[in-house]
Amino acid sequence: MRVNILNFLSAGFFLVFTACNIQVVDSAKRSALRYQASILVHVDPKGDGDGSHENPLGTLEQARDKVRELRLAGERRNIDVILNDGTYELEKTFILNLSDSAPEGSVTRYIAAKNSTPIISGGVNVMGWEKTDLQKENIWVAKVPWAKGNEFFHCLFDNTKLLSRAQSKKIIISNKSRVKDYAGELKYKYEFGFEDPGNNGIIRNWDNLEDIELFGMPTRKWLVNYLPIESLDMNNKEGKLAIQATYRMGGEFFVENSLDHLDTPGEWALNSKKGLLYYWPKSGKPGENIVAPRLDELIRIEGESDMSIEGLNDKPVNGIVFEGITFSYADRQKWTVDDIGLQHDWNMWDKSNGLLRFRGTKNCIVNNCTFINSGSDGVRFDLFSQNNTVQNSTFNNLGGTGILFSGYGPGLKDVNKRNKIYNNELKDVGSLFWHSPGIFIWQSGSNLISSNHIYDQGYSGLLISGVRRRFFDPIFKKMGQGYPYSRWSFPKGGRENLGAIRWDEISLESITEWSSYEPYMHARNNIIEYNEVHDCLKRLHDGNAIYLSAHGNGNIIRKNVTYNHPEGALIRTDDDSHNVAVTENICIGSKEPEAQGLCLKGLNFFENNLLFNSMLLTGSAGNTADIRSSYQKNIVYFSKKDSVFHQRLNMFSENLNKNIYYNPNIKLAENFIVEEQKGKRDTESIAADPLFVNMSEGNFSFKKKSPAIKLGINAISLEEVKKIGCTRDPWLERAIKFKGFPMVTK
């Protein structure tokens, strides 16, 4: 049965997906590499003309309206809006809707003029600074009367540098809950007690309490929250939040945005009640480019969304292209009581946030753009999203997620699919919301995520997920069934996932078998290949380079390289992750001898992978590994004498087999196999040098006498290794600059 399932994954699903992807790739080529547009509209920040080359228009809105006139008059050819050099400052979100949709087969392209770098900005320069007598006259103040309500900002930049908001010393947060599970009762996500170590007066009833936030990790260290305070009882040292925390309150927190704690050069605080911004510049005087973001989203391309299954009134915007443009300065995501959280609140569902947001779109392209210096997400595709592409772009210094594709919640509406994320560089994404991944695929399927370079992440690099079984308690109750996941109880009214589930469309034959849930999980048939993911988990814990949970069948993780991960597995299938083929990946450990390479839960197939100084293991919390899973034909190679080849694999028997284990102390590897075979595991596995052709040059083909050939292990050829990473900066070219292999940077 295992072989048939694996063949189905690697052959059947792949053939179907490849056919879909051919369509996506061809669509991208037709649009991004378009022939010269017949109609040109020119725009310049200093313009005041008619849109001609000689007399450009002055704003994006004017250019959009010009295009609308042309389309309304029947123009069906391509239209290029040419953006000249300069900064296009937005005072409100720039919206493209169905009136701006291109006819089928055509595009409307917002494109940089030749040799130009147009910048679209949601920021405003803060001027009029005056010195105060605070902190020995080191703190300056500026009037920002507009910075309240929706324009209250949560981040500030000195040109390209994200400045630190005033932050207190840590306080200890507690609650009165007797239940120790991290979800707990709803009220304990709002109510909290606090301790002030040393009685330093860290927390008090400020007159602008609505501006103050608690920052920290409620109960678990795989996420952070920014939580506005509704009220404080100083006598009893208790408080209440204005919005719920992800989990019950508890742990170390910090008070942010109080003038009381503006005590370090480089910090700032905003008092919206007085309309004053305070700042302690490191240089002694505020620079000329102190920028405050005043928008949550800079540009939104929005069709009409029909929430019904049939979607007869779904009308996506077609054929909008952005090329060669830089996007900067949106505010950090603001959470509200109406938000619906994606897994662990790692982002919010259908949220008005991001530098560039597509909501109900098809055949749209983001090509050769830069998303930089912002508190928000880079680009996100919500709800209906088909045949859209993000390629050849750079994401850097963002407070939120780099690229998000987020469909509808579990149910029968599956319309976020067949998209492409190709050849992008994502660095230092999640600088504010530390848990934000570089790429996040939620309830979105049949996508190609290929040749991206993701690194310097606060948490995980690349995620595919949906909603776990433990959230479906309302259906269990309707069925007269008890709750089988008592360790994880999620109360009614919780933010995470519940509001996105399409309850009336779901019918379960079994509340424990994943096969009953799978039809409603639309993150299926994705191909993740040739990506380079490294140096993640720089701020949080329990994260991974590539991570999967609660998705549909048929995802393929192949020919990626992952390395420099301080803890946790490089590639991990977590709770409710099934029928994933993890194959031909290169995993390089950095915490010898117990670096985690591949971590398996569920029914999955880990075959033909190369693990250097990293081990195989299974997860121990939540659902565990299915014994029908496969750990076969992998090479586990240690370059030092200390090695741990795998952990917690005792439940396996014949499906843990035909692996090669190598250690310079070959006797150690041989003894390991002898012990394994006592448990009827690794019966055909061997301890041997796999005899790569030239490991130091990245050629993992096998020499003629390699024992891997006899075991049927597939080689990863030099030609395939050269494809890994961004095409403009391939991984191997950097790797071979280091002496020896595997390459582990510092």
Task: Cite the ranges covered by each PLM segment.
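Short glycine/acidic-rich loop motifs that flank beta-strands on beta-rich extracellular proteins
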Residues: K92-T93, D296, D331-V337, N353, ...
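Right-handed parallel beta-helix
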Residues: N318-Y329, K362-N373, Q386-G400, D414-G430, ...
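Bacterial N-terminal signal peptides that target proteins for export
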Residues: M1-L9
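C-terminal motif of bacterial Sec signal peptides marking the signal peptidase cleavage site
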Residues: T18-A19
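Predominantly extracellular beta-rich ligand-binding scaffolds that present long acidic/polar faces
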Residues: E91-S99, G105-R109, V580-E697
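The right-handed parallel beta-helix/beta-solenoid scaffold, focusing on the short coil/turn
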Residues: I39, R77-I79, G86, K92, ...
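Extracellular polysaccharide-degrading/modifying enzymes targeting complex plant/algal/animal polysaccharides
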Residues: H42-I372, G411, F472, G480-P484, ...
